[in-house]
Structures are given as C-alpha cells and as structure tokens.
C-alpha cells in the first residue's frame, strides 16, 4: 500500500539500502518499511558524531518506557518525549534502546540495522516477545472505565488557571466523549487522547477559532482549511460518528488499516496524519490520564491478538466454509481485541479460533 509522512515530524529513519538502480531509498520508520525518492532524503553515517548528534531512542525510568524524538539530527537535543507504556521485564532502567518499529529493542544501533537488513529481529533484547503499546493498539470499539469527571479533572489539572470556557475548548467536554463513545462505538479515551494531542488541550488556534479539537482537514499544505464547527462538542460528534466509527474502523473504506491508533504500518495513523508518531503521541496522553486518576486504568483490560503481513478472512463461524464478513488489508501488526476463544475447524493443526472485536 502507499502511505505518506512529513519529514518535519521525524528527522531520522533506518537506511536499508538503494533500489530501482539507486533512484529509491529503502527505509524503516514508525513500523513500516518503504521506498522514497533518493533525492528527497539525505543518507548520513550514524557513527559520524560531528554530523549525527541525535537519533530516536527509548529509555526506561521510574517503571515507564519513554520514546525521545528528534526533529533535527544535527542538533544534540530532543523535541519531545512520549510515554509508550510500562517497563518490561527484559528492559533495564536508564539504558538506551534503539528501535524504528517500537516492538523490538536493541542495545546498539548497528545491531538494529543489521537485523533490519537481514529481515530478522534475532539480535534484539526481546526477539521472541515483541512489545506493543497497549493504548496504541487497543480497538477503537473498546469502552473506557474512566468517567466524564475523570477526563474533565485531568484537563483542569493540566491547564490550571486556563481551565475556563474562554481559554480552552476542552472545558467540560468529558460528557461528550463518553456519550458519543456509547452511541457510536468510538473509544472515548482514544478520542480524548487525540483531542488533547491535536488541540493542545483545546488551546490551539484552530481549536479556539474553529471549535475543531482534532485538526480535521488541517492539511500540512494549508492548516487554515481546517473544518469549522458550531461548538467543540460537535467536533467530537463528527470525529466519533464519522472519522472513527465509519472511515477508520469500517473495512469497506480505503482509510481502514485497522481499528486502533497505530503507527505508519497499521491503524488510523496510516491515513489520518502525516506525523508518523501521531498514534503514539495520542496514546501518551492516555497513559498520562492513567497516572493522574489513582486506582483506575484501562491498560490491559482487553487481551489483544495481532495479524502478520498478508490479508486474512474474518469469518462469521469457526470454519473456513463460513461466510467471510470481510478480508483484512495486508498491513502487518494489525490488532484486534479478543472477546473469547472457541473450538472449530482444524486449521494448520489447531482447532482454536478467536472471537474478535
């Protein structure tokens, strides 16, 4: 499939070689392997410390995993850091790890590149156990345990004195995230995370001038084209009813690459945003809400199953003769919520079938 990204949001990717007589560069970025015109990128030697002063990396602190992102590899600083989940048993605290897919982690940059070029992950620290950021991959059909009061309380705690109807369009919006989730099957916590990320807690110029909390139609070439709404709650309605429920979670639409936030390999991020870390950034705010509300969390409440590369049929019954409800896209790392496991026709020696959402 074809995709798109914006170099402003991601300065570095893994160089995997040249193709098409040197006219194309093969690379990995945000989980996807792709080709780009050679004259649109610059190939630099990672070991040249005078030129390459920063690259994306992961580190564990205080029991959490953080992803630091650079927007200029010639400068020794990082523009943003996103929480991408809880520290795993195979990870050490305060140790730098490298990864351009967020699933397999490496202690050295060269080991990572060598594995990518060989199409293996055997030299990663978790070769047999890929990591998936829960909030980045849980289904958009999930329901949250958080309340409208929880959502409003977090926005208020973050904005402090700016939490009023004049300075933020996210003032008292919690009710609408919950109501529209229950009506249209759009996970309230994910929509909340996207709104926080896209509108800077409802304080961005597009949010304030157009009641648009999601950057709908704010294309890179002309953000001023962003949709205008009569109220901020109507932008939540539009997002949940059309963007999430229909266009990004319904297989018949070309924008469907999996009903979850995802990255550039799968999920809403493939077609929704040019920022390759858009899904991860929204998930960051979901984790932050988790930490703000004591004793409550959605993380891990659903078990997930993942599909590898290639299209598969989703069937009505646990037999290959059953009607196919739809055929998935070929995207790898496509996730589904597991609703249960049943016995059915034996396929490749197994009679286990998953009921999925």
Residue ranges and their predicted role:
Residues 1-190, 201-322, 328-332, 346-350:
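Catalytic cores of secreted/periplasmic lytic hydrolases that degrade extracellular macromolecules
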Residues 341-343:
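Acidic glycine-/aspartate-rich tracts in secreted/extracellular proteins
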Residues 198:
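Pyridoxal 5′-phosphate
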Residues 27, 356-357:
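Solvent-exposed beta-strand motifs enriched in subsets of small alpha/beta binding domains
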């Amino acid at each position: 499939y074809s995709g798109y990204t914006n170099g402003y949001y991601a300065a570095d990717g893994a160089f995997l070689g040249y193709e098409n007589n040197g006219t194309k560069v093969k690379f990995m970025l945000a989980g996807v392997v792709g080709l780009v015109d050679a004259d649109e990128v610059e190939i630099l030697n990672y070991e040249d410390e005078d030129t390459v002063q920063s690259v994306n990396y992961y580190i564990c602190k205080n029991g959490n995993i953080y992803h630091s992102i650079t927007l200029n590899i010639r400068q020794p600083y990082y523009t943003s850091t996103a929480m991408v989940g809880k520290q795993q048993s195979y990870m050490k605290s305060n140790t730098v790890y490298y990864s351009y897919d967020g699933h397999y982690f490496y202690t050295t940059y060269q080991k990572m590149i060598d594995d990518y070029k060989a199409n293996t992950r055997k030299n990663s620290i978790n070769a047999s156990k890929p990591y998936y950021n829960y909030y980045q991959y849980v289904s958009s059909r999930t329901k949250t345990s958080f309340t409208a009061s929880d959502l409003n309380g977090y926005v208020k705690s973050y904005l402090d004195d700016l939490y009023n109807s004049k300075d933020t369009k996210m003032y008292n919006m919690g009710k609408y995230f919950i109501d529209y989730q229950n009506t249209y099957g759009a996970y309230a916590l994910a929509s909340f995370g996207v709104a926080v990320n896209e509108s800077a807690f409802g304080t961005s110029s597009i949010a304030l001038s157009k009641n648009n909390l999601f950057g709908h139609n704010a294309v890179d070439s002309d953000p001023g084209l962003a949709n205008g709404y009569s109220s901020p709650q109507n932008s939540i309605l539009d997002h949940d009813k059309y963007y999430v429920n229909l266009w990004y979670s319904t297989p018949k639409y070309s924008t469907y690459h999996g009903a979850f936030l995802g990255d550039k390999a799968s999920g809403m991020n493939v077609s929704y945003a040019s920022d390759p870390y858009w899904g991860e950034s929204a998930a960051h705010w979901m984790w932050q809400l988790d930490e703000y509300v004591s004793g409550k969390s959605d993380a891990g409440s659903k078990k997930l199953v993942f599909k590898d590369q290639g299209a598969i049929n989703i069937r009505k019954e646990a037999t290959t003769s059953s009607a196919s409800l739809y055929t998935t896209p070929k995207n790898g790392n496509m996730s589904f919520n597991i609703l249960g496991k049943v016995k059915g026709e034996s396929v490749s020696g197994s009679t286990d079938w998953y009921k999925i959402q």
